[in-house]
């Protein structure tokens, strides 16, 4: 991963998040009322459970990756290319580039070298605890209080690696989990019953101390196996209360269907983030509004790159329509873990977003999403 050139000092980052000295000097009421949480709610990280109030001192990134299999990018690129070809779309831009028009997902791109561009971190970092811990530790100076790792076993993520990174970096990390998408599923998914998948998800949640199911994905048309997994994730949510965030390969085709499947399985949409919707470039934000109206969250999760210019007008339209409480920000490991704060937020503020709105989106919304009242005791 490149040595990040931060566009904000720590003091500036904290102030734009609404938690610095300048923000503290504002009159009471200048920012939204503190987020409210159910009695007994916790945010589960790999090392400990936090009261949501304990993570109010900075931003939470809802979708990042700290470890992926060495062949992950190749498989991801092939799945993206197949989905785009099936929809007569041009090849996707590399991760960190402009999102595709008409709702196609972006490409993770190559890992590149350590001085490279917008791809995921290279294997020498993603498989070295000390190097990854150094990168994650840098986020503290950008005002980041917590990071969600959206990997799981079928993506090549080792939960013990994430625990060590959290311990060494001092940054609380929420572990995602589940089953990713058809090209990545273990072979047995096709023959497992929905009930068997529910049991496997609950076991994974217990053994790996998951704090969220995600990212849970589909690519083009949702396959029968993907539909089965989505239903199972919804039912596992009912048993565990863990929130859910998704991956949409072709957002314009699958976003609403993903939410439909989860809701039919018993999930309240306010426990769901539909991911990669920054890639669905639509001035009218039709799908985005529909999800917000139902109570769901919109994931703008490839921030800090050239694509910001196409995403910010959509965000501002949603903010002006009163949907700031439904937006979530992150970079999906494509642009450097701090760039959502240090590169992207100054652009959003320049477009007219207030400090109060930025605070709600980056500090309050992720805590409201991640907080849950556990139905099962923590194993580790």
Regions found by a protein language model. Name each.
Residues 1-9:
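N-terminal secretory signal peptides
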Residues 9-26:
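N-terminal export leaders
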Residues 33-35, 79-118:
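Disordered, low-complexity segments in secreted/periplasmic proteins that are enriched in proline
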Residues 63, 147, 237, 298, ...:
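Divalent metal-coordination and catalytic microenvironments
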Residues 112-116, 123-124, 142-161, 166-195:
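Metal-cofactor-binding active-site regions of metalloenzymes
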Residues 160-163, 187-188, 223-228, 251-266, ...:
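Distinct, well-ordered alpha-helical segments
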Residues 164-168, 172-243, 294-297, 303-305:
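Active-site gating/metal-coordination segments in enzymes
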Residues 247, 301-303, 324-338:
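Short acidic/histidine-rich active-site segments
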């Amino acid at each position: 991963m490149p040595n990040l050139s931060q566009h904000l000092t720590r003091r500036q980052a904290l102030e734009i998040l609404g938690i610095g000295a300048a923000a503290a000097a504002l009159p009471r009421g200048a920012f939204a009322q503190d987020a409210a949480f159910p009695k007994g709610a916790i945010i589960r990280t790999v090392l400990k459970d936090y009261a949501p109030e304990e993570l109010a001192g900075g931003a939470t990134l809802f979708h990042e990756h700290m470890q992926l299999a060495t062949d992950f990018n190749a498989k991801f690129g092939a799945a993206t290319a197949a989905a785009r070809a099936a929809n007569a779309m041009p090849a996707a831009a590399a991760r960190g580039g402009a999102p595709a028009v008409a709702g196609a997902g972006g490409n993770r791109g190559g890992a590149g070298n350590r001085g490279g561009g917008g791809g995921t971190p290279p294997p020498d970092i993603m498989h070295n605890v000390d190097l990854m811990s150094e990168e994650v530790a840098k986020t503290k100076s950008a005002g980041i209080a917590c990071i969600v790792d959206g990997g799981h076993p079928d993506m090549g993520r080792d939960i013990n690696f994430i625990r060590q990174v959290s311990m060494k970096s001092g940054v609380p990390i929420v572990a995602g989990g589940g089953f990713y998408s058809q090209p990545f599923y273990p072979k047995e998914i096709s023959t497992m019953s929905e009930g068997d998948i529910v049991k496997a998800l609950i076991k994974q949640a217990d053994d790996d101390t998951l704090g969220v199911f995600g990212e849970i994905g589909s690519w083009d048309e949702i396959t029968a196996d993907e539909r089965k997994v989505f239903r199972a994730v919804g039912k596992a949510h009912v048993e565990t209360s863990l929130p859910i965030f998704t991956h949409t390969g072709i957002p314009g085709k699958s976003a609403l269907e993903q939410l439909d499947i989860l809701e039919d399985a018993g999930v309240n949409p306010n426990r769901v983030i539909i991911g990669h919707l920054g890639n669905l470039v639509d001035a009218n934000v039709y799908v985005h509004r529909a999800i917000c109206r139902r109570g769901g969250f919109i994931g703008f999760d490839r921030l800090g790159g050239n694509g910001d210019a196409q995403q910010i007008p959509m965000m501002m339209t949603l903010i002006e329509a009163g949907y700031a409480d439904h937006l979530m920000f992150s970079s999906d490991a494509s642009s450097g873990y701090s760039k959502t704060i240090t590169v992207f937020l100054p652009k959003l503020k320049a477009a007219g977003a207030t400090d109060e709105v930025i605070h709600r989106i980056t500090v309050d919304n992720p805590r409201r999403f991640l907080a849950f009242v556990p139905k099962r005791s923590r194993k580790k």
